[in-house]
Each structure stands twice: as structure tokens, then as C-alpha cells.
Amino acid sequence: MCKFIQNQYIYLGMIVLMLLLTSDICRAEFTIEDENKLGREFYEQLEQHQMILHNKVLTDYITGIGNLILDQTTRTPFKFNFFILDSSAINAFATPGGYIYINKGLLLVAENEAQLAGVIAHEIGHANARHVASIISKSQKLNMAALAAMLAGVFLGGGGEASAAITAFSLAGSSSMTLRYMREHEEEADRLGIDYLVHAGYNPSAMVDFLKIMKQYEFLSKTMPSYLQTHPGTDDRIIYMDGLIMTRYRQPGKNSIIGNLCRVQASVPLSASELSRRQRQLETSLAKDPQNTDLLYNLAMIEDQLGANSSALEHLQKALVQSPDDHEILKSIGLLHLKTGRYEQAQDYLLRAKKSDP
């Protein structure tokens, strides 16, 4: 069974686990303690199935963004934790207890830090508003199929056999009430998220820009990205947030605060098929912006992993023309020369990299 479909069955199993764990809790108030316990159980299942990427560069980056956003909130019910999941599906979600998960697929399609920050701010909004607790508390008004639909909408996404199975099961028992709850939650998470984003200093339009990118993916591929499957009402959300930006958040913000997203993306571990797909994506982007230093660097790193050393060196040299004192570019050229046995050139570039180390 391919890893993608296998992961979908794991998610499905976790949803069943959540249903079982909450069946008794549903009869009473779903407390902060209950949320912490459920969130921890979900996290441990992800760890057990090796679905979390333990990559310091990636984790530090999203945690830095998350903490910057959390500094703008007046009250948070949880101690938040941020993780990258080893999934190429373009998705993100928050589980009970303040656990925020970003799929590596989403990390790779975001065009700048502000767009990624918008996704994280939205998920923090879900957690702070305790939307999963609200779903479970309302479950007395829903049958089990409708509750499964809502939990699947929060956590699953991504297509595949498991997604199709849970969707078919869920729709059979869901109702307009289910959809209304989900749309209300999305609107509240957007309202909270864009406020967090602005006060953190980011460009508020980035949230809308990311949704438009997802709509473009849907148009080009004829399939709906996981993020749109699990975050309904996209067109309405775009209109709503555009209105907020025009009336309340007109001040410009920054697209990058913590660090250069494009350089961070180069640290995302990819399978052979993912490397080839990423190479095509970067080549398409570079055709539109051939002098972009970050795109040249990122493409070179992919080519290096694919064994295309000559192409990698060519793109690094082009990047160096644009940014002659760039530490990472100089170091990468030196290491590439070292790998191919050009020791004198390697020494030269590595010494230059050392001198340029910020």
C-alpha cells in the first residue's frame, strides 16, 4: 500500500479513536483537560506511525512564526505546539489542546512567510475558539455519522480511498446543521486569524492570496486541494476577508519577519517522486522570474539531490551573480565542488563562505 493511502487510513483510525474517546465525554461539558488529553492522544498516534517530521530547521521556523502570532493574543487556553507532517497533501489543521500541524505539501506551495503565517494564525484561531470542543459538545444534537463528518472535515482531507470512504459514510448522516457549524467556525477562525496576523506585523492580504493560490490549484488540476476540502466556503471566505482588509486592516504589513521561507523550503525532505515534482514546480516558477536568487538556490538543491551536479552548479553560479556574498550559496558551491573532487575550488568557496558567515 502506498504511503499516502496508508497515512489516510491512519487518519481515519484516529478519527474513530476520537469518537470512542469522546463518546462518554459528550454527555457532559468538554473541558480544557479533556482537550489536552485528546490532543495528546492524537499526537502520540502520529508519532507512533512516524508521520511527524523531526527537522529542526522546519520546526524552529514554524514555531517562531507561531510564537510571534501567539504574542498578539490576549488569552490562550493551551500551551501550543507546532509540527510538520510528512504528507504531500496541501493541508493544515489544529487538534484539541493547541497542537498545530502543517503538512510539508502546504509548506512548499506557500509563496512567502506571510502566507504561511496566515494559515498558522487561522489554525490558532480554531484552537483558541475551541472549535473541536464546540463540535463535540454539540454532538448530542448530531448523530454519529454527522459527528464523524465534522471531525473528518477538521482532520482528514487529501483524497484517497480512506477519504472517499469517510466522506460517503459521513454525508449519509450529516445535515445542514453540520455544514453550518463548519462554516461558522471558518469565519470565526478567519476573523481571529487576520487580527493576529496584522498585529504580528504581517501583510493581511497574504491570507487571501493563499486561498487564491488554492483556488488556482483546484482549477489547474481539476481536483480540490486538501486545504479546501477541510476548510469549506472558500469563495465566501475570500470575499469576507477582502472586506475586512478594505475596511479595518488597510495598513501594509511585511511578507517576511522570521526568515526567508524559500530557503527554509530547501530543507524539506522529499522522496524521489516528490523531488521530480518539486523540480518541475521550481522550473515553472523560474521561467517567470529567471533572476530570482532563492528560486535558483532551491532548484540547485533539488538537482543536487537528483544527482544533476552540473545543472546544480550552473544554477548556483547564476544565483551568486545576483547575490555575491550569500553565505548559503557560497557554501553550497564549495560542497558541490568537494563532492565532485574539485578540492582547490571547494577550498576557495568554503573560505569565502566562512568570511561571509553572518
Listing of model-derived features with the role each one plays in the protein:
Residues 141-159, 165-177:
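Membrane-active amphipathic alpha-helices enriched in small hydrophobic residues
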Residues 102, 118-126, 130, 189:
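Active-site recognition of the HExxH zinc-binding catalytic motif
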Residues 11-22:
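Bacterial N-terminal signal peptides
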Residues 84-98:
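Catalytic zinc-binding patch centered on the HExxH motif and its immediate surroundings
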Residues 114, 124-141:
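Catalytic Zn2+-binding segment of zinc metalloproteases
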Residues 40, 52-54, 60, 176-328, ...:
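Extracytoplasmic and endomembrane cell-envelope/extracellular-matrix remodeling and assembly machinery
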Residues 26-30:
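Boundary at the C-terminal end of the N-terminal hydrophobic targeting segment
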Residues 104-118:
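Short pre-active-site segment immediately N-terminal to the catalytic Zn-binding motif
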